[in-house]
Amino acid sequence: MPRSQRNDNFIDKTFTLVADTSLQVIPTTQGEKKAFTYYRDGMSAQSEGEYAEASQNYYEAMRLEIDPYDRSYILHNIGLIHTSNGEHARALEYYFQALERNPSLPQAFNNMAVICHYRGEQAIQQGDFETSEAWFGKAADHWKQAVLLAPGNYIEAQNWLKITGRLKD
C-alpha cells in the first residue's frame, strides 16, 4: 500500500485527494502517474524523517519520470536527504544535477550556498583561512543566483552578502 494511503494527517490526506483528482483530469501517462505517486510518497516519508524510505521512493520516481523539470525536483529532494545525513559532497552533486535540468531552482542554489558556507566555517575552525575564503566565495556565488531568481526570499543570505561586501561582485 502506498504511503499516501496510510497517512492519518488531515492535510496530507487532503493533498493526496487533490493530487489524485488532478492526475485523473490532467492527461498523463501511467508511468508519469506512477512516478508522481513515488515522488509524493517520498515527500511524505522525508517529512517524517524516514530518509531511507524517502530515498527508495525518489529513486523509483527517477526511474519512471522522463520530464527534466519534474526530475529536477526529485534530484533536489535527494540532495536534501544527503544534506540532512551530513553527506555534503553527495548533496552538492544532486543539487548540481537538479540545476542542470532546471536552472531556475533557487532552493538548490540556496542549499549549495549553505553547504559552502558551512565548509567555510569549518575551514576557519581549522585555521585554514585561504580555504575558508574560497568556500565563502562559492557560497556568495550561489546565494547571488538564489536571490536573483527569488528576490523576496533569502533575506539572511542578502544580509550576509551585504555585510561581507560580496553583494557588489
Swiss-Prot record:
Subcellular compartments: Plastid, Chloroplast thylakoid membrane
GO CC annotations on file: chloroplast thylakoid membrane
Gene3D superfamilies reported for this sequence: Tetratricopeptide repeat domain
Keywords: Chloroplast, Membrane, Photosynthesis, Plastid, Repeat, Thylakoid, TPR repeat
TPR repeat positions: 35-68, 72-105, 120-153
Membrane disposition: Peripheral membrane protein
Main localization, broad class: plastid
Similarity field: Belongs to the Ycf3 family.
Function, as annotated: Essential for the assembly of the photosystem I (PSI) complex. May act as a chaperone-like factor to guide the assembly of the PSI subunits.
NCBIfam families membership: PRK02603.1
Protein name: Photosystem I assembly protein Ycf3
Native species: Huperzia lucidula (Shining clubmoss)
